[in-house]
Structures are given as C-alpha cells and as structure tokens.
C-alpha cells in the first residue's frame, strides 16, 4: 500500500472510530496540542485550544512553516471570515502540494472550529511530516515505525510490541526504548509490569527532561482506557524515533567533523614544526657559511694548524647533527604533502625562502664553501711549510755569507802594500787574485740568497720586512766588495812593476786551497741542508745522490793531502832560507789548519747525513704503510657503499614483492648501514693519522675520505627517503583502498617511461604514462592536461614524482571526502539551519574541536540569523581550499 493510500485509509478510519469513542478524542486533543506546541515554541508561540487557535489559519500556517522549513507566503491579516478561510486554504494547499489528499476536510470546518475536522487535519500533518518519512525495509510509515519499536524492544522482558494501543498500556515499552538508547537514564531492572502509572510517569519525565520530548500523553488516559488511541501513541512514539535517529546522525556527523578537524590540526602542527626546523637550519647555514668562506689566516703555521683543528671539529661534531636535521626536514615535508594530498587539502607552500629547494640550495652552497675551505687550508699549510723552510734556508745561507764577509771591506781598503817588498807586493797581488776567485765563487751564494728572498716575497712571508732588509744589506755590501776589489787590483798592478818575486808554493797552495775551501763550505752546507720530501722515491733520490757524493770523497781526500802537502813544503824552505814571514802565505788567508778542520767536519757530517736520510726513509715508509692501510680499507668501504646505494635504488625503482616487503628490505638495509658504521669510523681514524702525517696523495686508491663521506651521507639519505616514500605509498594504498595489483600496474607504467631512472617524469612522459593506463587525454585538450599537471605538480617544478602520480591515479579509482560532505554534517548538527551556534558546537563536539571551530568560523549574516550565529559553510569550503578561511 502506498504512503498516500495509507494516509487516506487512516483519515477514513479516524472519522469512523473517532465518532464512536470520545475517550480517544480526548487523548488526541491532548497529544496533538502538545505536538503542535513543541514545534510552535520554536517560533515563540503556542496554542491552548486546538479548535479555537487554528481558526484564523495564522498559527496553522506558522506550524507548517516551522515543521517544513519552507515559506507559505504572506498571510491575510484581516479578521473577517473570508480572511480566515483564505489563510486555512493556503495551509491546505501547501499540504496537498506535498502529495497529501485531504478527504472531507475543508477550510470552512476549520474556521468554524469543528473539533473532528481540526483533529483530522492535525493528524494528517503529523502523518505527513512526522511519520511518513519513517522508512524501514520498504514498509509503510506505520509498519516501519512498528518494526523499529519491535527491534529496539525485543531484548527486554515483559515487552511485546504488536500494535500502537494495547502493547503500550503498562508503560514498559516506553521505558525500554529510552533504556535501549540511553541506559544511563533508566534502571530497567527495577521496573515492574504491575506498576504502569509509575512506569509511564518515569518514561514521560525522563523523555521531557533529558531527551527534549514534550509530554503528549497523560498516564491516566492510557492506563485507564480499555484501548488507548493509536494515533496519540504513534504521534508520541514518532518523537522517540526522531530523537534517537537524530542523535545517531549527530554522533556520526560529529565524528566526521572531529576526524577532519584532527587531520587539519595535525597538518598545522607539521607545518609549524617544518617552519621551525627550516628556520633553525637556514640560520645555522647562514652563520656557518661566512666562516667557511673566510680565507684569511695570521700567515703562521701554528695559526693555520689551529684553524685546521677547528675545521675538523666542525666536521666531526657540528655538521653530522645538521645532516640528520636536513634529512628529517625533507622527510617531514614529504609526509606533510602526502597527508595533505590524501585529505584533499591544498599543497603546503612554506614561507618565502624556506622551500625544500631553498634549503637544498643553501646546503649546496655550504658544502661548496666547505670543500673550498678544506682545499684552501691544505694548500695554505703546504705554502706556510714551504715558507718556513725557505726562511730557515735564507737565514742559514745569510749567516754563512755574513761570516765570510767579516773583515773583507777592511782588507780591501788597506794600504799595507805600501810598506811591502817586491815579493810581498807580488804576494799581495796573488792573494788578491785568490780573493777574486773566492769572491766569484761566493757569487752563487749571493744569488741564491736573493732568489730565496724573492720567493719569500712572492709567497707572502709574514716577516718579509726583516728578510728584505737583510737581503738588501747583503746586496749592498756585495756591490761595495766588487768595487773595492777592482780598486785594490788596480793598485796592486801598479805596484807589481816594482815587486817581482813570488812564492810559487804559497801561490799554488792558495790556488788549490781556495776552491777546495769553497768546496768544503758548499759541501758542509749541503750536508746540513734541510729537505722536505713526500714519498719514498724522493728520499731515495736524496740517498742515491748522497751515495754518489760519498764516492767522490776519495778524490777529495787526494786533493786535501796535496794541499796540506804544499803547506808542509813551505816550512822547511822558510827555515832553510830564513825567509821573513815565510810561514805566512801571502796569497791567501787560508791555513792548513783551517782546511784540516773543515775537512774533519765534512767527514763527521757524512755519517750524520746518512742517519738523517735513513730516519726520513723510515718515516716515508711509515707514511707509505698508512697510504696502503687507508687504501685497503677505502677500497672495501667504497664499493660496499656503492653496492648498497645500487640496491636501495633498485628497491625504490623495482616492483619485487609487496610494499611491506620493500619497506622491510629497506629497514634491513638501514640496519645494515648502522651496523657497518664502525668500518667508516675506523677509516676516519686512519684518515686522521694520514692528515697528521701530512700525507696529501695516495696512488693506491681512487677514494678520498671526502668522497666516502659524501657517499655515506647520500646512502643514509637515500634509505630514509625511500622508506618515507614506501610508507607514503602504503598510506596512500590503505587510505584509498587500492590493491597491490593496481599499485604494481602503476609502478610498471611509471618505470617504463622513467627511462633514466630518476624517479620522476617530464610532462610529456607523464602524459604518455596516463595514456598507457587507459586515461583518455586528447592531443587537442591542453587545458585538461594543464589542470592535471596543476594537481600532480602544485609547486611547478616541471616534473611529476611517483607519489604525486600515485595519488592522482587513486583519485580515479576511489571515492574521496569533499567540502560538501562537511557542510551536510554541520547541517545535521544545526538541525537543518543554515547556521550553527557555539552552544550547539560545544554540545555535539569534544571541547578542543568545538573551540577550534568557534575561533575559525565567521559570523552568519543571512536571514533568520540569531545572535552568535556562525557560518559553517564558508568554514567547510576553506578546509578544502575552496575559499579563504
């Protein structure tokens, strides 16, 4: 039977039965009056007499407007009969417009106060607006309401609902309905079937006080009537149905709102955490980069060594936590973007200068400055070490030269030859010739001193002023010596015409002794000369050169004996011929004793030089062992890192097993990396020894500690990034309900077009991938493709990553929540009003969620707005990015 047919049958039964039972009419009048007042109070009015108060049609129209939520038009305000009939007809027309056929009910009977017709009209309204919308398993409203009551009361003792009259006489059915939905309000176990009055009054009082259901029946009328009025009972029971059904809807709506708000609050917390971490990391980079870009030192070796120690401390202590912070920041950003996409929220755009790309760029700048800083420090150490060596060499040669020049100027300006005899003059001349030879031999040393000073100038030696001053003094003195030598030679040439005799032995001694003495001086310089080598080959070259030098000592010993023999030849001759001053050699200041002393010094320095070279050879061998030790370790760690990186990349690009299998394998790789960390630490210790030994090259391996550090950091970052991507894919799969087969299909298509295995697709590759999956995109439909690109690449990077691609494809296969669903949920809480109040939010939502909504909602300014009304529509659309919050 249709709903309209049921309503027509109900009206006909009401006319027949109502005429026969005045008690039912009394019950209906009370129940219908209470039902009408429960709605009219929403408009600030009520009725006292159901026949009289509806006669002018005004409150009847108002009642229909309240229960339907629609406007019936402007009523006639006149008091004439035709005004009242017109108003009642408007109400009747509205009822008929809802598909209700009114039988035997006319406006005139209502205006005349006909009790039967008025009650019949109200019953028709109750059927249409309170009972007709009750639907249970395609039954009529009455049958559906009865079935609902039977299901709700089935578990209760002494309750057997079969109709809407006798089944309710003991009041237990009403108590059972309340207890079923609100067990906290009634202790059903204490109720008795033989105490109906208490049962009714308890149910009516609890319903009115706690469930906002008005008292429409009197216990006496039901208990003491043989057969209670069915329509009165149905009217009252329908309130229970709507009250409990609405509570269930409100709970569902509240849960939906809480879920959405919690997601939104969690996302906001993630955004705030990202902003804080990004600001902290960028500030650290901003502070650290200028320090790394500072290429100044105090130009001393200890100061530069201190700066190198500071840099090593930065590498070991300060940078690793920041590397981890950067990885966490990227992971949090990707997780946040995934959550936003899954909840259909707009993509998160960090504040200006805090994008992941900005942080990556700043980090690259930091690492570039770091690499340049380390290279500069090492080169500066080598430069300063070279400077220190050159300064010591300059001092040593300058000391020898200044020692040699002592007294030379006084000798050259002396006029001693004026009192000499001929042989003495000739001796002075020969002596001067020997001095010139000695002077020429010292020319190389002076040039070496000047060259060293020039190199110190070019390399920026810190105490270059004293070097230049000393070099200038030596050069000036050397020029004066040259001038004075020329003058004295001219003077001796003039005196030579007078003085002829020459002591050949002295002359021969002087000729031989001078170069031999220079050779001794140079040899002593070479034997005590400092050296810097960086390899076994270099020290071996010095050892070979020293061995070659030792092979020449035999010839030198012969020359020494010859020179000493010449001096020894003079003594018997001077004694024999009593030559005045014959033991003094007029041609040279050198004596056999000096030559002997220097020769003895040279022979003592040779084994010392042997020991020094052998000590350096041992040190270089130790350095070579360090190189080999580092290379052996690096040649194991480097390939291991590369294999792990290849394996992690293969997992990220592959499709073997489920996502959970991939995630487990990634965690296993992560654990393996953690366990492998001691090998890297051991390598760091060896590298520390290498640096302390000042070893700068290693021909046994292609790996440097810097490349291994970078590879290690990239491996950690790759593992964590892949774990994050797989977790996001699992989250996407589970939240969207896609199958593993669908996920594999998406990954297969994505990998097919990702030729370079970069984990991203260019726009044209992405378009081809969509077409391969059956997504229809015409070549001439560029706006549609641009719309899709805006979804998968909101930051306009020019590439589509797999997680964005997966999110887009899941939209095509799964249902999603929308702003409209949120609006419908708030409308249920608001009782179908276009606005909601703070009290309603606090009543239906948890305190923190309710206060969150109250702070964010804007005032509602539409029609029928009450003070404090809030606009939930704009709030809901703003949550989904469809308007500004």
UniProtKB/Swiss-Prot annotation:
GO BP term, example: actin filament bundle assembly
Binding residue positions for Ca(2+) 1: 754, 758, 760, 765
Domain Calponin-homology (CH): 26-130, 139-245
GO molecular function: actin filament binding; calcium ion binding; IgE binding
Pfam families associated with the record: CH, EF-hand_7, EFhand_Ca_insen, Spectrin
Entries under InterPro entries matching the protein: Actinin_actin-bd_CS, CH_dom, CH_dom_sf, EF-hand-dom_pair, EF-hand_Ca_insen, EF_hand_dom, Spectrin/alpha-actinin, Spectrin_repeat
Residues annotated as domain EF-hand: 741-776, 780-815
Residues the record lists as binding Ca(2+) 2: 793, 795, 797, 799
Keywords linked to the UniProt accession: Actin-binding, Allergen, Calcium, Metal-binding, Repeat
Spans annotated as Actin-binding: 1-242
Quaternary structure (record): Homodimer; antiparallel.
Family (UniProt): Belongs to the alpha-actinin family.
Protein name, as recorded: Alpha-actinin
Organism: Dermatophagoides farinae (American house dust mite)
